[in-house]
């Protein structure tokens, strides 16, 4: 092998190594910014197609309905705890901050946060539904995939 071919081989190897390193770093950076969507039932029993359950500490988005009677507010701070549910199960959520104006018991929400021990979500963001007939698209898609509809929502007679 002559010197010219050797130089070309080294250049090609260096370019491939640089490309592999760049792809690896990009994927590593994106991994920490990806929030996978789950329903409460998928957190409890795993994704239907893969049976993969989320890990403690994983960032995720969870969509479901706020369970009537589950909202508890701390009178001394903005801390709120509530339960969200779907046709297969329920998970507890803690959130510290101002809730959206449309947040109510029996309404659809999507929370974004981290999974903690005991199927508890520490929410960083809470998104509420827009009208009475609205179900978050992710929740509706997941429930259609399960061939189930949301559990019946109990209406507050005072409203």
UniProtKB/Swiss-Prot annotation:
Residues 1-8 are cytoplasmic. It comes from the Bacteria. Residues 30-159 are periplasmic. One of its GO terms (molecular function) is heme binding. GO terms for biological process: cytochrome complex assembly. Keywords: Cell inner membrane, Cell membrane, Cytochrome c-type biogenesis, Heme, Iron, Membrane, Metal-binding, Signal-anchor, Transmembrane, Transmembrane helix. Heme binds at residues 130, 134. It is found in: Cell inner membrane. It is a single-pass type II membrane protein. InterPro entries: CcmE, CcmE-like_sf, NA-bd_OB-fold. Pfam families: CcmE. Residues 134-159 are annotated as: Disordered. Residues 134-147 have a biased composition (Basic and acidic residues). GO terms for cellular component: plasma membrane. SUPFAM superfamilies: Heme chaperone CcmE (SSF82093). The chain crosses the membrane at residues 9-29. PANTHER family: CYTOCHROME C-TYPE BIOGENESIS PROTEIN CCME HOMOLOG, MITOCHONDRIAL. Heme chaperone required for the biogenesis of c-type cytochromes. Transiently binds heme delivered by CcmC and transfers the heme to apo-cytochromes in a process facilitated by CcmF and CcmH. Belongs to the CcmE/CycJ family. This is Cytochrome c-type biogenesis protein CcmE. It comes from Escherichia coli (strain SMS-3-5 / SECEC).
């Amino acid at each position: 092998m002559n010197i010219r071919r050797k130089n070309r081989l080294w250049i090609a190897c260096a370019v491939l190594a640089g490309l592999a390193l760049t792809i690896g770093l990009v994927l590593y950076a994106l991994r920490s910014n990806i929030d996978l969507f789950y329903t409460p039932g998928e957190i409890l029993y795993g994704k239907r197609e893969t049976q993969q359950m989320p890990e403690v500490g994983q960032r995720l988005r969870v969509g479901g309905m706020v369970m009537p009677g589950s909202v508890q507010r701390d009178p001394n701070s903005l801390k709120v705890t509530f339960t969200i549910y779907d046709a297969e199960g329920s998970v507890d959520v803690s959130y510290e901050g101002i809730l959206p104006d449309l947040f109510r018991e029996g309404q659809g929400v999507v929370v974004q946060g981290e999974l903690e021990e005991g199927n508890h979500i520490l929410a960083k963001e809470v998104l509420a539904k827009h009208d009475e007939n609205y179900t978050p698209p992710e929740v509706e898609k997941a429930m259609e995939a399960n061939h189930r509809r949301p559990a019946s929502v109990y209406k507050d007679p005072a409203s």
